[in-house]
Each structure stands twice: as structure tokens, then as C-alpha cells.
Amino acid sequence: MRSDMIKKGLERTPHRALLKGTGVPQSQMEKPFIGVATSFTDLIPGHVGMRDLERYIEKGIHSGGGYAFFFGIPGVCDGISMGHKGMHYSLPTRELIADMVESVAEAHRLDGLVLLTNCDKITPGMLMAAARLDIPCIVVTAGPMMSGRGEAGRKYSFVTDTFEAMARYKAGVIDAQELQVCEDNACPGMGSCQGLFTANTMAILTETLGMSLPRCGTALAVSALKRRIAFASGERIVDLVKDNVTPRSILTRAAFENAIRVDLALGGSSNTVLHLLAIAHEAEVELPLETFDILAKETPQLASMNPAGEHFMEDLDTAGGVAGVLMQLGDKIKDNPTVMGLTIKQLAASIANVDETVIRPLSNPVKKEGGIAILSGNIAPKGAVVKQSGVSAAMMNFTGTARCFDSEEAAMAAIMEGKIVAGDCVVIRYEGPKGGPGMREMLAPTAAIMGLGLGDSVALITDGRFSGGTRGPCIGHISPEAAEGGPIALVEEGDRIELDIPGRRLQLLVDDETLAKRRRNWQAPAPKIRTGWLARYAKVVTSANTGAVTSAD
């Protein structure tokens, strides 16, 4: 075992003494040392229930014959950090989390890891660490929040009834009392936000990748089932250590293709493009951006999930969960091993019935194509991403007038002041991985556009990214980004921009000669942040089209 390096032999006398100083009895020294990377914090609703899950994981590890050690991993709530300076830090924490898990596991020679996670950047950061370390690992996602409940059976959700409600109030559609009711009911308790936003999409994809146990991706945070999954995961990691089952034996090209197909079938968050690319990078699996679009054209959307649709995570769980989606996808799924001991096709076969009002069959899809599309054109030569499942038919083809803003705050002010009108195409730039820095989510502007009733007449494009709660004609991840001299930096107020989602085109309707002249006059802006972690991050982060990973090259 790896842990023998810190607990066996004469030379490890000091090491054993220190371990005994933590309370480890001599009788436990022969057991596998299992690290539990916990991202508990009472700052995030999705993580406040983790103390309970920690207990069940620890019980499972000890029941399975291992010895548990806990260490803490930070977490950032994208909702709380949204719309201000805090959002600069969200995506960069993904890299910090991967580095911290790697550092503790390697420094202490842990034999295996249980990765307790839930929210947006924490789950991909944990998976990146698992792929990088390639020691036995299992992931426990803490589970979704229930939908909020109101009078006459109304269901509330975080994004629609907070960010969008704010804009509806500003427009006079609802009054202050209605807004207060929304605020009080949108988040009824612990768990990751209720729709198919980034956290829940990543939990589902973690199960699809084979890195968590059945139902882990959809079982509610408040459920006893989640506790049982936590216990079983603790037991299972000891078996994985004994059998030396490592993440790279599971995170194959087939696993990533399966995850993409499930993502597309459900209409998941566009952030998953960044995260799957980054996890594949750590697993040394080649996964070009174009893969998402190739699979989207042959994978129909089978569910209509909140925020763009009517179903919540609780509905998906009772309808069949991940296994139900896999069963409906049938032969489009490739067989692959998992941490659960079953193959992915065996998991699909384990479910008896699927509620086809929630997870439709291939013969009756919600839409003929999957939820994500990859666009390109002279404004995005290395690609851009749109969650087409959240775009109305009226906006699948659109030509608009560029309204240019060099920050999210400037765009948000213009939207809320009524300066954006039907026929406009909002351009938010210098918000990419380097330029932001941190590639902030543009949820506030997109929610404001939807809340003001402009979702069928205004588009938004950016080198930033979007929340999983975003809906509407919002194109992000434009690469190269403005800070690197990408063509989005050359767009001027009043230019015409053409969006053709079915044709996968995003085109600035300006001739090459004019663009060449603008490029000669363009100067890179000074870095927005010159000290601290974000300044270092901006120097080493790569483009969105490669997952916005950090590189030592």
C-alpha cells in the first residue's frame, strides 16, 4: 500500500509517532489509509449537510476495513459570488481544489480517497484531482435541493424566482410583496440548486462517468438514501484500494462520450464543456471541443429540465435518474467500467421502469438535437458554446445590432436602465479566463434580459461563460478571448452580428479589410488584477476551447 511509506520500517518511527499523536491506534496501522476530502462549509446551501454525510462515509470506511482521515477543501457558491468581484474567483478555485487534493494525498501517501463534493467548481476540481493522482477514488455528491413550495402547489426555483424575478419587479410585472415571497421560498433548505444547473449536471455526469455509486447523482440532499450512498461509498473505496481500481481505468474516451451524451440528452449546463475538457486533460484522454457538436447532432434531447423546462431534480430522480437516461439512450451508450462494480450498461439494465413523461424515449424527443451546440465563425474562430436547449425557436436564427461592453457591470447597468432594446446583440468582452480574470458567469445580465421579456428579441455573446441557470440566446466561451486579441475585441458599437445555431455559425458582418484595420489599431488592455492568486492565474490559464486549464508551459 502507498501508506506503507509513512508507517512501516525503522525509518518511519517518527511518522508513526505523529500518527499516534492524532489518535491512530497501533491496531489500525495495517489498514488502508483512506482520505476523505470534504468540502463542508456553512456558506453554501449545497454543502451545509455534509457533516452528516461525513459520519456515514467514515462508518462505511471503518466497516469496510479501512481507516478514515478527513481534510478540508474550500468551496465557493456561484450564486452568492455572482454579479460582483467574487465571481472572478469561482472558476480559478477549480484549479486550487485539484491542487489541494493532490497535495494532501501525495504528501501523506493516502491509499485512496472519498471526494465529498456538490457545487459548481468543487465537483470538477475533485474529479480533476482523481484523474491526475490516479489512485483509487470514489465521489459522493451531496445531492440536490428540493424545489421551493408555495400556494396552490406552485414550485419555486433559485434562478427563475430570484435573478429573473428581480428584473420582473424592476419592470413592474410583480410587486415588492411578490418579490419577497420569491426570495423566501426559492431556496427551502440544503442541497445544490434545484434545476439542471451546473452542480446537478456535474453530479449526474460524475455518475455517468462511473465515479460515483448508482442514484448518487440525483438522490436529494435531505433523503435517507443519500446517507446510505455515503455509507456504501465508504465501504466501496476500501475494495477499490484492495483491487487497485484507479480512475484512469474508468475515465476512458468511452466514459467521456457517455457523459457528453447524457449531458446533451438532459439539456445540461454549458459549463460542463469546460469541465469535461479539463477532466479529460488530467486523465490524458484526447477530447476535442468538436466532440460535443458531433455527438449533439446524433443525440436528441430527451428531458425538459428547469431552468428552460418544467422538471426539477426531484422529478428526474423518481423518473429513473441516471440509469433511466442511460436506458432510454440505449445503443448510443458505450459500455465502460465504474466504481460500483457494474458496467455502465449493467447499470442501465438495472432499472425496471422509466417515467417517460420526464425522460422521453428516442422515438419521442423534446428536441431532435442535444442541448449544447458548438458555434464558430469570424468572431469565434476557435469556437463558442450555446445551450441550445434553452433557446426559443424564434432566436435560433437572429441578426442583431452590437451593443459593446467591456465588463459585466457595464452591460448590467445598461440592461436595467432600459438601454437595451429588441434587435440588440449585447457583447460582453474582456471577461475570459485571462481577461476577467476568471471567466465570470453572466447570469445577472441574461436573467435580466429574460425577466424584462427580451428573451425572444435580444441575444448576448461573451468570452465569459454562463450559469447552468441561464436560459435564452446566450453564446459564451468565445475563443480566442478579447484579452488575447480575439476578434470579439474588434467588434464596434452598431456592427451587425449574425447568429445561426442550426448552421453552427456566429458571424460578425464586417469585411476582412475593416477588421484588419481595426486589428492594427487594437492594443491589449492592462491586466485588471496585478497581485495575488488571480494575477498568477491569468498568466497560466489556457483558452476556454481547451477547458481553461492551467499550464506550466
Curated annotation (Swiss-Prot):
Sites where the protein binds Mg(2+): D78, D120, K121, E441
Q: Read off the Gene3D superfamilies from this record.
A: IlvD/EDD C-terminal domain-like
> What is one Pfam family matched by this protein?
ILV_EDD_C
> Which EC number(s) does the record attach to this protein?
4.2.1.9
Q: Which GO terms describe its biological process?
A: isoleucine biosynthetic process; L-valine biosynthetic process
Q: GO terms for molecular function, please?
A: 2 iron, 2 sulfur cluster binding; dihydroxy-acid dehydratase activity; magnesium ion binding
Q: Which domain of life is it from?
A: Bacteria
Binding residues for [2Fe-2S] cluster: C119, C193
Pathway note: Amino-acid biosynthesis; L-isoleucine biosynthesis; L-isoleucine from 2-oxobutanoate: step 3/4; Amino-acid biosynthesis; L-valine biosynthesis; L-valine from pyruvate: step 3/4
Q: Which reaction does it catalyse?
A: (2R)-2,3-dihydroxy-3-methylbutanoate = 3-methyl-2-oxobutanoate + H2O; (2R,3R)-2,3-dihydroxy-3-methylpentanoate = (S)-3-methyl-2-oxopentanoate + H2O
Keywords (A to Z) from UniProt: 2Fe-2S, Amino-acid biosynthesis, Branched-chain amino acid biosynthesis, Iron, Iron-sulfur, Lyase, Magnesium, Metal-binding
The record describes how the cofactor is bound as:
Binds 1 [2Fe-2S] cluster per subunit. This cluster acts as a Lewis acid cofactor.
The prosthetic group or cofactor this protein requires is: [2Fe-2S] cluster; Mg(2+)
PTM annotation (N6-carboxylysine): residues: K121
One cellular component term (GO) for this entry is:
cytosol
Q: Active-site residues? A: S467 (proton acceptor)
* Keyword Iron found: yes
InterPro entries (alphabetical): Dihydro-acid_dehy_C (IPR042096), DihydroxyA_deHydtase (IPR004404), DiOHA_6PGluconate_deHydtase_CS (IPR020558), ILV_EDD_C (IPR056740), ILV_EDD_N (IPR000581), IlvD/EDD_N (IPR037237)
Q: What does this protein do?
A: Functions in the biosynthesis of branched-chain amino acids. Catalyzes the dehydration of (2R,3R)-2,3-dihydroxy-3-methylpentanoate (2,3-dihydroxy-3-methylvalerate) into 2-oxo-3-methylpentanoate (2-oxo-3-methylvalerate) and of (2R)-2,3-dihydroxy-3-methylbutanoate (2,3-dihydroxyisovalerate) into 2-oxo-3-methylbutanoate (2-oxoisovalerate), the penultimate precursor to L-isoleucine and L-valine, respectively.
Quaternary organization: Homodimer.
Do you know which PANTHER family this protein is assigned to?
D-XYLONATE DEHYDRATASE, D-XYLONATE DEHYDRATASE YAGF-RELATED
* Matches recorded under HAMAP family: IlvD
Similarity section: Belongs to the IlvD/Edd family.
Instruction: Kindly provide the name given to this protein in its UniProt entry.
Output: Dihydroxy-acid dehydratase
What species was this sequence derived from?
Answer: Geotalea daltonii (strain DSM 22248 / JCM 15807 / FRC-32) (Geobacter daltonii)
Upper classification of the source organism reads: Bacteria, Pseudomonadati, Thermodesulfobacteriota, Desulfuromonadia, Geobacterales
Q: Report the gene name.
A: ilvD
